[in-house]
Amino acid sequence: MVSQRRDADAPKDSPKSILESLAGTRVLVVEARYYDDIADELLAGARAAIEAVGAEARVFTVPGALEIPAAIAILMDAGRKAGGPYDAAVALGCVIRGETGHYDIVAGESARALMDLSVAEHLPLGNGILTVETMEQALARARVSDMNKGGGAAEAALSLLAIKRAANLEPAR
């Protein structure tokens, strides 16, 4: 029989304990503001999740979801070269299906590029690019008071960072 470890028994370097000590962590947030109301909600949720652990968010804006992966790659590289690297990244945006195949390209290629970047660079990255059928679906997923996908994306990035630190791949600041 496999037993589940209680939180009190968790080692000090477990992802949970590291997640609780992320003060000073620098999180890069790149948002596409194609739909301002949705972008506002996604960003509010992400900021709240980042600030809840004492981390710092640095926000950059791009025109659309396809530009997000390139912007993250550019900004991560710039941060390393400037001596102030980011510890994690969050992608925020929204793609709503229209009448053409453009949706499939934007949704698929942005997700693929983010995954490729995350895996190749060992980058803790939360994907908060919504891919939905309608504006109503987008608003429900974006609203902090509803599904809070912006907050969820930030929490995913922070959780991956905690795992990376627990594996001793990146020192805590």
UniProtKB/Swiss-Prot annotation:
<dbReference type="InterPro" id="IPR034964">
    <property type="entry name" value="LS"/>
</dbReference>
<feature type="binding site">
    <location>
        <begin position="99"/>
        <end position="100"/>
    </location>
    <ligand>
        <name>(2S)-2-hydroxy-3-oxobutyl phosphate</name>
    </ligand>
</feature>
<comment type="similarity">
    <text>Belongs to the DMRL synthase family.</text>
</comment>
<feature type="active site" description="Proton donor">
    <location>
        <position position="102"/>
    </location>
</feature>
<feature type="binding site">
    <location>
        <position position="127"/>
    </location>
    <ligand>
        <name>5-amino-6-(D-ribitylamino)uracil</name>
    </ligand>
</feature>
<dbReference type="GO" id="GO:0000906">
    <property type="term" value="F:6,7-dimethyl-8-ribityllumazine synthase activity"/>
</dbReference>
<keyword id="KW-0686">Riboflavin biosynthesis</keyword>
<keyword id="KW-0808">Transferase</keyword>
<feature type="binding site">
    <location>
        <begin position="65"/>
        <end position="67"/>
    </location>
    <ligand>
        <name>5-amino-6-(D-ribitylamino)uracil</name>
    </ligand>
</feature>
<feature type="binding site">
    <location>
        <position position="141"/>
    </location>
    <ligand>
        <name>(2S)-2-hydroxy-3-oxobutyl phosphate</name>
    </ligand>
</feature>
<dbReference type="GO" id="GO:0009231">
    <property type="term" value="P:riboflavin biosynthetic process"/>
</dbReference>
<comment type="function">
    <text>Catalyzes the formation of 6,7-dimethyl-8-ribityllumazine by condensation of 5-amino-6-(D-ribitylamino)uracil with 3,4-dihydroxy-2-butanone 4-phosphate. This is the penultimate step in the biosynthesis of riboflavin.</text>
</comment>
<dbReference type="InterPro" id="IPR002180">
    <property type="entry name" value="LS/RS"/>
</dbReference>
<dbReference type="GO" id="GO:0009349">
    <property type="term" value="C:riboflavin synthase complex"/>
</dbReference>
<dbReference type="GO" id="GO:0005829">
    <property type="term" value="C:cytosol"/>
</dbReference>
<feature type="binding site">
    <location>
        <begin position="94"/>
        <end position="96"/>
    </location>
    <ligand>
        <name>5-amino-6-(D-ribitylamino)uracil</name>
    </ligand>
</feature>
<protein>
    <recommendedName>
        <fullName>6,7-dimethyl-8-ribityllumazine synthase</fullName>
        <ecNumber>2.5.1.78</ecNumber>
    </recommendedName>
</protein>
<dbReference type="Pfam" id="PF00885">
    <property type="entry name" value="DMRL_synthase"/>
</dbReference>
<comment type="pathway">
    <text>Cofactor biosynthesis; riboflavin biosynthesis; riboflavin from 2-hydroxy-3-oxobutyl phosphate and 5-amino-6-(D-ribitylamino)uracil: step 1/2.</text>
</comment>
<feature type="binding site">
    <location>
        <position position="34"/>
    </location>
    <ligand>
        <name>5-amino-6-(D-ribitylamino)uracil</name>
    </ligand>
</feature>
<dbReference type="InterPro" id="IPR036467">
    <property type="entry name" value="LS/RS_sf"/>
</dbReference>
